[in-house]
Regions:
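Juxta-kinase regulatory segment immediately upstream of eukaryotic protein kinase catalytic domains
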Residues: 1-34
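Catalytic cores of nucleotide-enabled group-transfer and carboxylate-activating enzymes in metabolic
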Residues: 98, 129, 161-162
Length: 168
């Protein structure tokens, strides 16, 4: 299917799905396996396979796709340039009338800080376990701010941890 078809796919498109994309290596097929975040008609984020490699795909469609793509790409580059820990951007592209895509390394076995918080939110307020999750989140925000960066849609699902590393 074409990327632009996602514009009309709604909140729960049928998966898995194959989407035709092209990068510097030429045309290829992205196999979208599951969705992690959906803004219907605008943004679809999920686990996928690209050229035999597991990736996290951010697919941007609709009338604001180009603007959202440019903002996402700029943000990813700024994080990397400032030496902040972020998944490696493997491929990206923007095609007029279709939309944009960013394909990142898939951080296997990562846990979002949202999931970590859910595991401890029922504890008494300010339990050590809650304080540890909040400290990780606030530490990440502080590191970004120290580099002159901020994230407009900051939430705990955007912070992933794996093997002692926190990814932005």
């Amino acid at each position: 299917m074409r990327l632009s078809a996602l514009k009309n796919a709604g909140r729960t498109p049928s998966l898995p799905m194959t989407i035709e994309l092209a990068d510097a290596a030429g045309p290829g097929q992205l196999q979208l396996l599951s969705l992690l975040r959906v803004l219907p008609g605008q943004r679809y984020v999920g686990a996928a396979v690209w050229r035999g490699r597991a990736v996290l795909a951010k697919l941007l469609v609709g009338s604001k796709a180009a603007r959202h793509f440019q903002r996402e790409l700029k943000g990813v580059r700024l994080l990397a340039e400032q030496g902040l820990t972020t998944p490696l951007l493997l491929a990206d592209g923007l095609q007029e009338g279709e939309g944009g895509w960013l394909l990142f390394e898939f951080i296997d076995g990562a846990e979002s800080l949202a999931d970590a918080w859910q595991a401890v939110e029922g504890l008494p307020p300010l339990a050590d376990e809650q304080t540890a999750v909040l400290a990780e989140a606030l530490g990440a925000i502080a590191r970004m701010h120290a580099k002159g960066l901020w994230q407009e849609d900051l939430h705990l699902d955007n912070l992933l941890r794996q093997s002692g590393k926190l990814y932005l």
